[in-house]
UniProtKB/Swiss-Prot annotation:
Name of the protein in question: Glycerol-3-phosphate dehydrogenase [NAD(P)+]
EC number: 1.1.1.94
Subcellular location per the Swiss-Prot or TrEMBL entry: Cytoplasm
NCBIfam families: PRK00094.1-2, PRK00094.1-3, PRK00094.1-4
PANTHER family given in the database record: GLYCEROL-3-PHOSPHATE DEHYDROGENASE (PTHR11728), GLYCEROL-3-PHOSPHATE DEHYDROGENASE [NAD(+)] 2, CHLOROPLASTIC (PTHR11728:SF1)
Active site per UniProt: K191
GO molecular function list: glycerol-3-phosphate dehydrogenase [NAD(P)+] activity; NAD binding
Reactions catalysed, as given in the entry: sn-glycerol 3-phosphate + NAD(+) = dihydroxyacetone phosphate + NADH + H(+); sn-glycerol 3-phosphate + NADP(+) = dihydroxyacetone phosphate + NADPH + H(+)
């Protein structure tokens, strides 16, 4: 299959290599021509995925429209807040018959839209049955080394989800399917915010009790928002829900947990972000999800606390005190 992977960060590069090794005809798009030339010359992404050699068959290109026209499947692996701008670059092309697989996890700031909603809004010729999401506990650092990983391909069309499953599945990259793309995208977006909270807990020096509470009550927030927006509760107990939440809150590879940890140690958000060469999606998602939760009337206290610490400069100690001294309630609330 002809597959275009849009976005040459760590995850886009990892998936491009995985698909090329499987025998697909894969072309990886890099936004900046000079970066594309460097990738092609070095046959390795030394900036975002050092040490992973490109298969000879993997081609690199900065030319978006010819790539999209050539492709049968388009994998969008750009940061969530850059998705709209990227796909506007080919919104006039005929996309009939093509499958679009989004792998970026986030909610768009300003609109509150999930990534599949952005795709459908910007690409008027695309129908929901052409769009899928590939989410789950899948750090690029481990997938690129061939370590066992499981994810879920989700689409409103089971046939589309199963096609994505067939295309991506390998002996070490197991792909499940479901049709709850709403639940999958909500879970995959909110978990990054909860991971920032978990990192803050680590940075302060709190113990396992606090971490367990953050993960568990974070799951409750994900579940409430998911249900409000039409997702299915069972999705939250799957790979895109608890699976991705656990790995993002605990892993040393988690950029979102790292941001939180540094905030917990007293550093400013600007200082932390300026020293990172990759995106921590939870920073943007905390603003977008906080605004979305207010718009739809869903109480998300951990999300609110993270937003306040990141963007309103609320002291970490005060945010924690406010969380712990809220009105008492039943666990299911």
């Amino acid at each position: 299959m002809n597959i275009a992977v849009l976005g040459a960060g760590s995850w886009g590069t990892t998936l491009a290599v995985l698909l090329a090794k499987k025998g697909h005809d894969v072309r990886l798009w890099a936004h900046r021509p000079e970066f594309a030339a460097t990738l092609d010359a070095e046959r390795e992404n030394r900036r975002y995925l050092k040490g992973v050699a490109f298969p000879d068959s993997l081609q690199i290109t900065p030319h978006l429209q010819p790539l999209v026209s050539w492709s049968e499947m388009i994998v969008t692996a750009v940061p969530s807040q850059a998705l709209r701008e990227t796909i506007l670059g080919f919104c006039t092309l005929d996309l009939s018959g093509k499958i679009l697989v989004n792998v970026a996890k986030g909610i768009e700031i300003g609109t509150g839209k999930r990534m599949s909603e952005v795709l459908l809004e910007v690409l008027p010729g695309v129908c929901p049955s052409q769009v899928a999401a590939l989410y789950g506990p899948s750090h690029a650092e481990e997938v690129s080394k061939g370590q066992p990983t499981t994810v879920v391909a989700s689409s409103s069309s089971l046939a589309t989800a199963e096609k994505v499953q067939e295309v991506f599945h390998t002996s070490m990259f197991r792909v499940y399917v479901n049709t709850d793309i709403v639940g999958v995208e909500i879970a995959g977006s909110v978990k990054n915010i909860i991971a920032i909270a978990a990192g803050i807990s680590d940075g302060i020096g709190f113990g396992d009790n606090a971490k367990a509470a953050i993960i568990t009550r974070g799951m409750a927030e994900i579940s409430r928002l998911c249900s409000k927006l039409g997702g299915e509760a069972v999705t939250i107990s799957g790979l895109a829900g608890i699976g991705d939440l656990v790995v993002t809150c605990l892993s040393r590879h988690s950029r979102n947990r790292y941001v939180g940890e540094e905030i917990g140690r007293g550093r400013s958000l600007d200082e932390v972000i300026s020293q990172m060469n990759m995106i921590a999606e939870g920073v943007h998602s905390s603003r977008a999800v906080y605004e979305l939760s207010r718009a739809v009337g869903v109480d998300m206290p951990i999300t609110r606390a993270v937003y306040q610490m990141l963007f309103e400069r609320k002291p970490v100690e005060q945010a924690i005190l406010d969380l712990m001294t809220r009105d008492l309630k039943q666990e299911r609330d």
